[in-house]
Each structure stands twice: as structure tokens, then as C-alpha cells.
């Protein structure tokens, strides 16, 4: 994000999933993390839902202004160690940039030099979680 501070990496990441939607659902997937599995369409939807849930939660939370560090608690409900904070902050900002690109969030440079983020819609409904429990069966169908 520092090299391209206005980048929208989450939009690119979500767009990349469209290329995988053409794969037959019985394709064997060999992921970089986790065990091989069959069920690409279900897994793609889980990943998309996970990020859309975060986007909804951030939009709901930002009906009052917050900076990205404050929003880490919203996205990551566990304690982050020092090595995780920078990565988590990048992910949080990526979500905020996508919300700005969608016209749902505005950013303001405050007097202290820190950006605050505020939802355009002040009446955002409380988010309803799309993402269900990760289906353990996906990894067992190999």
C-alpha cells in the first residue's frame, strides 16, 4: 500500500476469482495453504462471503469516523502480535479502499495527519453474516 497508496488490491483479488468460476466443481484444487480439495465453487463463495462480511461490518462501524488502526479490532477479533499488525493494517486499508471505490466510504485527512474513514450512508443496517462455518467436508472429499 505504501508504494501505491491509492491502490485497490481487494477489488483486484475479488475480480481474480471470476477466472476460477469457469472451473468444473469436481476439479482437484491444490491450494498454497491447507489440504487439496474438490469443491472449488463452494470455496470461492466462502472466500468472497468472508470479505463481503468484513466490508459490511466496516461500513456499519464507520457511521462514525474511525482511523484504520481503530478498525483492526473490528476485522480481527483476536490479539495481533507485532509481526501481524502491519499485514492486518494493509488488509484493513484494502477493504476501506474498496468501500471508497464502491462509493460507500469517504476518507478525510485529519489535523494530526491520520486518515479517518466514514460511511456515506449514516443509516447502515447491522450486518447479517453471509459466511457460514467453513465446510470441513470440502477438504475431505478428495
Regions inferred by a protein language model and the residue ranges of each:
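C-terminal regulatory/interaction regions
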Residues: 59-142
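Metallo-beta-lactamase
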Residues: 1-55
Amino acid at each position: 500500500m505504501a508504494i501505491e497508496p491509492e491502490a485497490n488490491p481487494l477489488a483486484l483479488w475479488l475480480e481474480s476469482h471470476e477466472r476460477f468460476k469457469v472451473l468444473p466443481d469436481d476439479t482437484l484444487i491444490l491450494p498454497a495453504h491447507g489440504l487439496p480439495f474438490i469443491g472449488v465453487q463452494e470455496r470461492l463463495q466462502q472466500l468472497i462471503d468472508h470479505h463481503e462480511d468484513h466490508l459490511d461490518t466496516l461500513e456499519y462501524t464507520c457511521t462514525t469516523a474511525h482511523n484504520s488502526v481503530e478498525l483492526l479490532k473490528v476485522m480481527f477479533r483476536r490479539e495481533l502480535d507485532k509481526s501481524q499488525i502491519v499485514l492486518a493494517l494493509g488488509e484493513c486499508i484494502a477493504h476501506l479502499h474498496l468501500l471508497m471505490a464502491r462509493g460507500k466510504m469517504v476518507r478525510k485527512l485529519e489535523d494530526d495527519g491520520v486518515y479517518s474513514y466514514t460511511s456515506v450512508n449514516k443509516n447502515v443496517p447491522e450486518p447479517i453474516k453471509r459466511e457460514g462455518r467453513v465446510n470441513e467436508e470440502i477438504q475431505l472429499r478428495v
